[in-house]
Amino acid sequence: MNDVSKASLPKAIFLMGPTASGKTALAIELRKVLPVELISVDSALIYRGMDIGTAKPNADELKAAPHRLLDIRDPSQAYSAADFRRDALAQMAEITAAGRIPLLVGGTMLYFKALLEGLSPLPSADPEVRSRIEQQAAELGWEALHQQLQEIDPVAAARIHPNDPQRLSRALEVFFISGKTLTELTQTSGDALPYQVHQFAIAPASRELLHQRIELRFHQMLASGFEAEVRALFARGDLHTDLPSIRCVGYRQMWSYIEGEISYDEMVYRGVCATRQLAKRQMTWLRGWEGVRWLDSENPDRARKEVLQVVGAIAD
């Protein structure tokens, strides 16, 4: 698409960043001064009843700046990148038709990628192949299967942790079904996003600062009743750690504590570590992201002004 035809497309803003970087606070500030409507891009915020551990915007924040695509699934339900793309496109069209600009804010980079580039033609799940993979895992362990993926698709293996059975089995399943690697297939894009997108990423200047923010926020969540929130989910009886909702960072570790598998101190330690690992993965995505403007989360006023400098002209 040439620059002229691209300029005629409706406008959209991406505000991306690692967990605990101040994305939500900045988005709320921007809504006060720009004709934007917010769309959440977060695979944890979609779940109802999961508010504290996901750092979901509170009632006052949502009153000041409503977020779309929050609380749209029960924790027992699945939600894919394809589901997100469909829902986000519908919301973006509605916002644009009302003469406003969609501002998509969050840290689920796979969702941003699916929205921006379209979805690659991955094969559907095959229960027989998946069962064979799980049987292998039971016999050899997931570490051995990760080594197998390393030989088949080193790029995917570098991105997928050996302790992430869902993503690991999916990467192997894709190869066994199609004969092509996950990396190869994901380089084949679907329909590109029909918007002119201004992309921003917000993060602290150093990893140490981000780690401090993560640890502080995890302790704030605990003080705000995170344990009680997870106990309520646990008491339902229909949720388990194979579900994407309960595998969310923090929830999985608290679940292990409630089940008596680990101590409280170990839960806190693992929860903070898992959140740091999530932030590291998010930063890896962002460093390789094309066309992104970086903002310093330690200077929110300056970050806001930088966005306004770029976006102010398109909002007039």
Curated annotation (Swiss-Prot):
GO biological process: tRNA modification
Spans annotated as Interaction with substrate tRNA: 42-45, 166-170, 247-252
Cofactor: Mg(2+)
Quaternary assembly: Monomer.
Single GO molecular function: ATP binding
Name assigned to this protein: tRNA dimethylallyltransferase
Binding positions for ATP per the UniProt entry: G17, P18, T19, A20, S21, G22, K23, T24
Site positions per UniProt: Interaction with substrate tRNA: T108, R130
Family: Belongs to the IPP transferase family.
Gene3D superfamilies, per the entry: 1.10.20.140, Crystal structure of tRNA isopentenylpyrophosphate transferase (bh2366) domain (1.10.287.890), P-loop containing nucleotide triphosphate hydrolases (3.40.50.300)
Lineage of source species: Bacteria, Pseudomonadati, Pseudomonadota, Gammaproteobacteria, Enterobacterales
Binding site for substrate: T19, A20, S21, G22, K23, T24
UniProt function note: Catalyzes the transfer of a dimethylallyl group onto the adenine at position 37 in tRNAs that read codons beginning with uridine, leading to the formation of N6-(dimethylallyl)adenosine (i(6)A).
The reaction(s) this protein catalyses: adenosine(37) in tRNA + dimethylallyl diphosphate = N(6)-dimethylallyladenosine(37) in tRNA + diphosphate
Name of the encoding gene: miaA
Enzyme Commission code(s) on record: 2.5.1.75
Keyword entries, A-Z: ATP-binding, Magnesium, Nucleotide-binding, Transferase, tRNA processing
